[in-house]
């Protein structure tokens, strides 16, 4: 990631990434922003940057990454594991991202559409 960002910056481009949920334990949004990434898609990697007392997400033993609905449900629960809004850690992360001119594009509407589609299929 760092090499790609470095090359991108050499030619004067901004950059964005979709952080893979399987990799954000090792490389979260703060790592990317500090390396020079200028924006992120969705929000994967942001709760992990906001963790206070853990590095690894606390997923249940039956977590199934291959099941999109299960993955979205459990990913949404990561916010409960993150620092509380406006706490010192939360403010420090947000302040650093702002100081790095980092942009977040959460793209939440697709989650609602996917949820509604799956709910409609259950009732067929």
Predicted regions and their residues:
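Accessory carbohydrate-binding/adhesion or oligomerization-edge regions at the termini
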Residues: 113, 117
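Conserved small/polar residues in nucleotide/adenosyl-binding loops
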Residues: 122-124
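Histidine/acidic residue-rich metal-binding segments in metalloenzymes
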Residues: 1-106, 118-120
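Acidic/polar, glycine-anchored loop/turn motif associated with catalytic or activation segments
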Residues: 110
């Amino acid at each position: 990631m760092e090499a790609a960002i470095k090359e991108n910056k050499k030619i004067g481009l901004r950059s964005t990434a979709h952080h893979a949920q399987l990799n954000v334990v090792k490389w979260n949004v703060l790592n990317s922003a500090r390396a020079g990434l200028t924006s992120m898609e969705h929000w994967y990697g942001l709760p992990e940057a906001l963790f206070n007392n853990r590095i690894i997400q606390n997923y249940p033993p039956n977590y199934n990454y291959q099941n999109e609905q299960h993955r979205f449900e459990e990913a949404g629960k990561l916010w409960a594991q993150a620092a509380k809004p406006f706490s010192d850690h939360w403010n420090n992360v947000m302040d650093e991202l702002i100081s790095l001119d980092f942009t977040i594009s959460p793209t939440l509407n697709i989650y609602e559409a996917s949820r509604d589609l799956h709910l409609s299929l259950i009732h067929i």
